[in-house]
A protein has these predicted regions:
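Glycine-rich nucleophile elbow surrounding the catalytic serine of serine-hydrolase chemistry
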Residues: 115-120
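Short cysteine clusters
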Residues: 111
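Intrinsically disordered, low-complexity regulatory segments
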Residues: 1-6, 16-17, 23, 171-201
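Cysteine-based protein phosphatase catalytic domain of the PTP/DSP
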Residues: 7-106, 124-159, 165-167
C-alpha cells in the first residue's frame, strides 16, 4: 500500500468537521479499546448528538454505557445504491431541529465508511440550514475527500417536497448537482477497497 493509499484509508474513521455544528465520519471500531478511543475523541470534539445511519449495525448500547451525555439517534438505512426515501431524510432533519431546540448542538453524522449515507444526510441538513445546492457539496468534499454523497439527488428531492418548492427550481438545481458530480468524480470503488484491506497489506 502506497503512502497516498494509506492516507485515503485513514479517512475512514477520521472526524471531519463541516461546520461548527456538523461533523461527518465513519463508524466505531469493532474492538472495544479502539471504539472507546474514538468515543473519547468525539467527546473532546464536543459532539452532543450522534446520528447513526447504518442499517447493518447499532452502537446504541456502547454510547449509552460509555458516553451517556451524547444523544444517540438511530436512523439505519440500506446502502445498495437505490433511492433513499423522503421519510428517511425527514427523520434526519427532525433530529437536527430537535437538537437545536435543546441548545447548541454539534452533530456527528455517520454510516459505516462515511462515503455515502452519512455525507448524504449531512447534505440534507446543510440544505435545510439554507446552504446553496453546490456550495453544500463543496464544503462536504473539502471536509472529507472520500465523501461520494451518492444520495444527494434524493436529499434534494426530499428538500423540495418538504418545503413545497417550485418543481422548476428542482430541475435547475438537479442539473447543477449533476454538473458538479461530473466535474468532481472520485474513485469510490478504490476507496472502499482500501478501507476493507487489512492495515498490514
Amino acid at each position: 500500500m502506497t503512502s497516498d493509499e494509506r492516507e485515503l484509508r485513514a479517512w475512514h474513521r477520521r472526524l471531519c468537521p463541516v461546520t461548527d455544528w456538523l461533523t461527518i465520519s465513519g463508524d466505531l471500531q469493532n474492538d472495544e479499546e479502539g471504539a472507546l478511543t474514538q468515543i473519547r475523541e468525539w467527546q473532546s470534539a464536543g459532539i452532543t448528538d450522534v446520528v447513526d445511519l447504518r442499517q447493518e449495525w447499532s452502537d446504541e448500547d456502547v454510547i449509552y454505557h460509555h458516553a451517556p451525555a451524547i444523544h444517540y439517534h438511530y436512523l439505519g438505512t440500506h446502502d445498495n445504491g437505490g433511492a433513499q426515501s423522503d421519510a428517511w431524510f425527514d427523520a434526519g432533519i427532525a433530529v437536527l431541529h430537535e437538537a437545536r431546540a435543546a441548545g447548541d448542538p454539534r452533530l456527528l453524522v455517520h454510516c459505516h465508511m462515511g462515503i455515502n449515507r452519512g455525507p448524504s444526510m449531512a447534505y440534507a441538513m446543510l440544505l435545510e440550514d439554507g446552504w446553496d445546492v453546490v456550495e453544500a457539496l463543496e464544503v462536504l468534499r473539502q471536509a472529507r475527500p472520500i465523501a461520494a454523497i451518492a444520495y444527494a439527488r434524493d436529499a434534494l428531492r426530499a428538500h423540495y417536497r418538504r418545503h413545497g418548492l417550485d418543481p422548476a427550481g428542482f430541475a435547475a438545481d438537479l442539473e447543477r448537482q449533476r454538473a458538479w458530480f461530473s466535474d468532481n468524480h472520485i474513485d469510490v470503488a478504490k476507496v472502499i477497497r482500501l478501507i476493507r484491506q487489512p492495515a498490514s497489506a
